[in-house]
UniProtKB/Swiss-Prot annotation:
Residue pairs linked by disulfide bridges in the UniProt entry: C362-C373, C367-C389, C391-C400
GO biological process, any: carbohydrate metabolic process
Keyword Ubl conjugation carried by entry: no
Coiled-coil ranges (or none): none
The species this protein was found in: Caenorhabditis elegans
Enzyme Commission number(s): 3.2.1.-
Gene: chhy-1
InterPro entries: Aldolase_TIM, EGF-like_dom, Glycoside_hydrolase_SF, Hyaluronidase
Domain EGF-like: 358-401
Designated name of the protein: Chondroitin hydrolase
Keywords, comma-separated and alphabetical: Disulfide bond, EGF-like domain, Glycosidase, Hydrolase, Signal
Length: 458
């Protein structure tokens, strides 16, 4: 009897493990797979009448009336008008704001003002869109403070030398770095915590993070450098507090003629962002920022080519970011309405519709109509076999071909009537004296291909 019990249990375990191998089943506690949203973060509310821009007909999400305040899709907080964030304007040491250095800022005063700003910008306490904090005047790591940002190193060392005039240069530099990073962490973390407390359903994070080296692809590399991966790993304290990641794959005029190179850069950053999510904040959403104008400030009529849409927006969609955010400035928006409208209707909108049709086709052919296709890795002109599937409940498998449930799995193809194999724990109960009792029926199963059927009973 013990031998029979052992073989029955072993068979159930083998069936369960074999069925689950390679599964992409989401599970009852996780959300269903969704296709990437596209969000219109362009302040085009002034575009009226014949120049109004209707992005919703292309499936693009927007705030009500395309406003930046009080909407349901997004809110963005810029350092110059949010709280009392300390910084040197344009990295100029002679123009400090709110103390200039983070270690000279007033965190309490900042949080008081930031609370007012959040309540004003997001009046809905149940807001569940993206909440982006945009701090670009300084970087929260000493090692990242190069070029114009080195002013924060210079001024931090100057401050520490004033505080400790008899210390050695090495001691001063060590303490300056420590004080700077500690102050940065306080401002970044406490601001996030405030936002999460006031609007707990929002997706909070900092624009431009994670980061990647901009020269990916110049040699034969396709990933962010080891150095930048280390920088991102050292920001673990930031990922632990974030609920969203907001990398930027913006293109600029100097990049417009290099769509292949741009593709590698975009793919490397999205891949790195997924690594950070996987290792440090599995519950974080990924919202990728992109543009449609190379330089909306000086050449607003110079829009992305279709090749560069493929290298940015299209790639982020196929790699299944939670959303792709199309951003632009409000500068001279009134005079840009006509060209924006033309580009949306003639290029951007039709391109998104084509991408959607291709993903619909992939869904049916690759995922048997039961999941969403996505690219695990960047791939130019991907074939259908380059895509993987995120399966809808209760399906799983490489092509969502199997049907399962939380307490177990079923091995027959989903198109067949499933015979569910219960979870192994269902075969046991605990008696009053604490011993485990085996409750499995006296029967054996046999497997032919993907089918399992009752072979015989004892």
């Amino acid at each position: 009897m013990v031998i029979v019990w052992y073989h029955q249990l072993l068979l159930v375990l083998l069936i369960f493990i074999g069925a689950a191998k390679g599964a992409q089943y989401i599970g009852s506690g996780a959300s269903q797979p969704n296709r990437t949203d596209v969000v219109w973060m362009v302040p085009s509310w002034t575009c009226k009448n014949e120049y109004s821009i209707d992005v919703e007909k292309y499936g693009i999400l927007q705030n009500e009336d395309q406003h930046f305040v009080g909407g349901k899709q997004f809110a963005i907080f810029y350092e110059h008008s949010f709280g009392k964030i300390p910084y040197f304007k344009a990295q100029n040491e002679s123009d400090p704001k709110n103390g200039g250095l983070p270690q000279m800022g007033d965190l309490e005063a900042h949080l008081i003002q930031a609370e007012k700003d959040i309540n004003e910008t997001i009046p809905d306490e149940n807001f569940n869109g993206i909440a982006v904090i945009d701090i670009e005047e300084f970087r929260p790591m000493w090692e990242l403070s190069w070029g114009p940002f080195s002013v924060y190193k210079t001024e931090s060392i100057r401050l520490t030398r004033q505080q400790h005039p008899y210390w050695s240069t090495k001691q001063i530099e060590w303490q300056a770095e420590r004080d700077y990073e500690k102050a940065c962490q306080k401002f970044f973390i406490e601001t996030l915590r405030l936002g999460k407390r006031l609007r707990p359903n929002a997706k909070w994070g900092y624009y431009l993070f994670p980061k990647c080296n901009g020269d990916v692809g110049q040699k034969s590399d396709t990933d962010c450098s080891t150095l930048f991966q280390k920088f991102n790993d050292n920001l673990h304290w930031l990922w632990g507090e974030s609920t969203a990641l907001f990398p930027s794959i913006y293109l600029y005029p100097s990049q417009k003629q290099n769509p292949e190179y741009n593709f590698v850069n975009s793919g490397a950053l999205i891949t790195e962002t997924k690594r950070i999510k996987r290792n440090y904040c599995p519950s974080c959403e990924i919202h990728v920022f992109t543009k449609i104008e190379y330089n909306p400030y000086y050449t607003p009529d110079d829009f992305y080519s279709k090749q560069n849409l493929a290298s940015t927006l299209d790639l982020a969609i196929k790699m299944n970011a939670n959303s792709v955010v199309i951003w632009s400035t409000s500068q001279s928006i009134g005079s840009r309405c006509g060209s924006l409208q033309t580009y949306v209707d003639n290029t951007l909108g039709p391109y998104l519709q084509l991408t959607d049709r291709n993903l619909d086709k992939c869904r049916m052919e690759r995922c048997e109509g039961r999941g969403e296709c996505y690219l695990p890795r960047p791939k130019t002109n991907p074939a259908i076999y380059n895509f993987a599937c995120r399966c809808e409940r209760p399906y799983f498998g490489k092509s969502c071909e199997y049907r399962g449930r939380r307490m177990g799995v079923s091995m027959p193809k989903a198109s067949q009537t499933p015979q569910v194999i219960p979870d192994v724990t269902a075969y046991f109960s605990t008696s009053s004296n604490g011993t485990k009792k085996y409750n499995a029926p006296n029967q054996f199963y046999s497997r032919t291909g993907g089918d399992i059927k009752l072979a015989r009973k004892l």
